[in-house]
């Protein structure tokens, strides 16, 4: 093999090994996150979501009102 092929192969193996080690270190956190999601520990409060939606609707109405008051150019 020529040296340029060996260098290319070396860098390819280096990149693949780095990506695999990064993926393997993520597995424990993925398992823990999926278990807590299935058990429902991270359920959001529906009332908080409703309040956020109402606030968003209010801001949107205020923005439309403000834009209606601006003169057209």
Swiss-Prot record:
Keyword Secreted set for record: yes
Major localisation: secreted
Effect of residue 36 to K: Important increase of antimicrobial and hemolytic activities
Superkingdom per UniProt: Eukaryota
Residue ranges the record assigns to the propeptide: 45-73
Record's subcellular location: Secreted
UniProt keyword annotations, A-Z: Amidation, Antibiotic, Antimicrobial, Cytolysis, Fungicide, Hemolysis, Secreted, Signal
One cellular-component annotation, GO: extracellular region
Lysine amide found at: 39
Name this protein carries in UniProt: Antimicrobial peptide TsAP-1
Organism of origin: Tityus serrulatus (Brazilian scorpion)
Taxonomic lineage: Eukaryota, Metazoa, Ecdysozoa, Arthropoda, Chelicerata
């Amino acid at each position: 093999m020529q040296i340029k092929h060996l260098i290319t192969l070396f860098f390819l193996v280096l990149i693949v090994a780095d990506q695999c080690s990064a993926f393997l270190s993520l597995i424990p956190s993925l398992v823990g996150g999926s278990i807590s999601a299935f058990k429902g520990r991270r359920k959001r409060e529906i009332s908080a979501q409703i309040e956020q939606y109402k606030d968003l609707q209010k801001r949107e109405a205020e923005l439309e009102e403000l834009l209606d008051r601006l003169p057209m150019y």
